[in-house]
């Protein structure tokens, strides 16, 4: 974009995994960024490190979206906000099955509060962090944006679907609104500096942090859930995408959310599926170690394969994933060895 004066972006959940990498990319592209986060999934340390990497000072507020007055205070303090990128959410699929009401309260009601605050302050443009889980079990592969949605297998996925529906309804009744929904597949990796990465609280929800924790000795073995799927090696296949490609997808979506109105949806994926064993092999190559794993029974709810059709984002946003699985594993290992305790110091105490 040729704009001299960049927009000011409010990023909710900007201290989290995807949020922090997107904040870096926004700042590098010349945008002004304001972050709100309640630090349930993210760490204040990630904001400090973003400031170190980018040389920027980031206004950051400890705000829970369930407290609408706190959101309104941020909009009042920063009347220059013109676009919102909304990451803030609870994100553990397994936990959502155990605590569905918590996920609906935080992910859905929190978003309603945010939308109402936007309406009260005349902000009408938002990019929403959604998920490929809204597609449920694949009816066909690769999955494009016309694949049926709503047949979700977890309250987490339902909460993302519900928010998509709410945003669609807003666009229907408010013609000036512009919404871009980005459905991510499986984000992996870390910033090339090794200063920012995924820091799961407790037991990781995703495969790759588990693999890296086994490699560095924090865990003794990786459990592989099933090797009898109808895939090339019997293990589950997913579309893994580098976190930096995901972040760049938000930059690509910026012109669309600025220059048009209405409700638009895009997949962010590579279009290439990798199995659990493929990931293990690539990570062994990155770290130079053997990964100790053990095959156990399938998990309830897991599907054999998921893979994106990313052509719409390529055509309409000019965005395409550029990193491969080896790149993802290399950058993840770089983050892991530099930060064996995540954002905590070596004594395990928080800053």
Per-region residue spans from a language model:
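N-terminal Rossmann-like NAD(P)+-binding domain of SDR-like oxidoreductases, especially those catalyzing
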Residues: 1-190, 339
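Short, flexible active-site loop motifs that bind/organize anionic cofactors or intermediates
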Residues: 13, 61, 86, 93, ...
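Glycine-rich, flexible loop/turn motifs
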Residues: 46, 93, 137-139, 143-145, ...
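Short capping/connector residues at structural and topological boundaries
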Residues: 98, 139-140, 146-148, 161, ...
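Short-chain dehydrogenase/reductase
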Residues: 104, 153-161, 197, 201-205, ...
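A general boundary/transition motif marking the beginning of the first structured unit of a protein
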Residues: 119, 198-203, 301, 320
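Hydrophobic, Gly/Ser/Ala-rich alpha-helical and linker tracts in large acyl-processing enzymes
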Residues: 191-204, 211-214, 220
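C-terminal substrate-binding subdomain of Rossmann-fold SDR/epimerase-dehydratase oxidoreductases
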Residues: 207-351
